[in-house]
UniProtKB/Swiss-Prot annotation:
Family (UniProt): Belongs to the universal ribosomal protein uL3 family.
The organism of origin for this protein: Rickettsia conorii (strain ATCC VR-613 / Malish 7)
Gene name of the record: rplC
Name by which UniProt lists this protein: Large ribosomal subunit protein uL3
Covalent S-S links between cysteines: none
Region spans: Disordered: 136-155
C-alpha cells in the first residue's frame, strides 16, 4: 500500500476522445508536496507517512510544530495529512512527491470536503418531491410533511431526514480514472467531478477497490 498525496483542485474542463465523445475532466495541481515525518509500527502502532503541502510563514507556526519541521529540515507546511502505508513503502523525510507518483489510466480514490450550502430545505438536501402545488395545499408546498407518528412513540426518531445544514462533509469518491498527467504544469487530469470548491485541498491515493473497465 503506497502513500497518497495532497493536491489542490484547480477547476474543470473537457476534451474529446477518438470517438467524438466529450469527457469531463477535473484538474488538480501537485506542488510543494513533501514528506514531513514517519509513523512506525514499533513506536506508534501503525506505519504511515506524514505529508505536507504549501509553504507557510514561520511566524504562523506553533513552537512544537516548528521543531517538527526543523527536524525534517524543510520549510513549514500549511496542510498536513497522514497516509497509511505498508512497511516496504517508506519514503525518506524531506523527499518531494510529484505528479509522476501516478500514471495515466490508473484508478484513484479522492477524499475532499464538499461545498457548504448552509441551511437547506428537505427538497434540496434530500431530494424530496415536496407537497402538491395546488388542490388545497397552502404555504407548505416545499415542506417535508409529517415527521412522526402519534402519541406512541410520541417523538421524532434520530436520523429523520429533515431540513438542516448541508455540505461541508468529508467524502471519498472511489475509482476515478486518471486521464493524463502533465509533469511540466504539475497537473493531474481526472475523469469526472470531484467534491470541493476551486483551490480547495484534497487527497489522492491508489484505488482500494480495483476495477477493470474501458472508458
Amino acid at each position: 500500500m503506497r502513500t497518497g498525496i495532497i493536491a489542490q483542485k484547480i477547476g474543470m474542463t473537457s476534451v474529446f476522445n477518438d470517438k467524438g465523445e466529450r469527457i469531463s475532466l477535473t484538474l488538480v495541481k501537485v506542488d510543494d508536496c513533501q514528506v514531513v515525518g514517519h509513523k512506525t509500527l514499533e513506536k506508534h502502532g501503525y506505519n504511515a507517512l506524514v505529508i505536507g503541502v504549501k509553504d507557510k510563514k514561520i511566524s504562523r507556526v506553533t513552537k512544537p510544530m516548528r521543531q517538527v519541521f526543523a527536524n525534517a529540515k524543510i520549510s513549514p507546511k500549511t496542510k498536513l495529512k497522514e497516509f497509511r502505508i505498508s512497511e516496504e513503502n517508506f519514503i525518506d523525510i524531506a523527499a518531494s512527491l510529484e505528479v509522476d507518483h501516478f500514471t495515466a489510466g490508473q484508478f484513484v480514490d479522492i477524499t475532499a470536503t464538499t461545498i457548504g450550502k448552509g441551511f437547506a430545505g428537505s427538497m434540496k438536501r434530500h431530494n424530496f418531491r415536496g407537497l402538491e402545488a395546488s388542490h388545497g395545499v397552502s404555504i407548505s408546498h416545499r415542506s417535508h410533511g409529517s415527521t412522526g407518528q402519534r402519541q406512541d412513540p410520541g417523538k421524532v426518531f434520530k436520523g429523520k431526514k429533515m431540513a438542516g445544514h448541508m455540505g461541508c462533509n468529508k467524502v471519498t469518491i472511489q475509482n476515478l480514472k486518471i486521464f493524463a498527467v502533465d509533469k511540466e504544469r504539475k497537473l493531474i487530469m481526472i475523469q469526472g467531478s470531484i467534491p470541493g470548491h476551486k483551490n480547495s485541498y484534497l487527497s489522492v491515493k491508489d484505488a482500494i477497490k480495483k476495477i477493470s473497465i474501458t472508458v
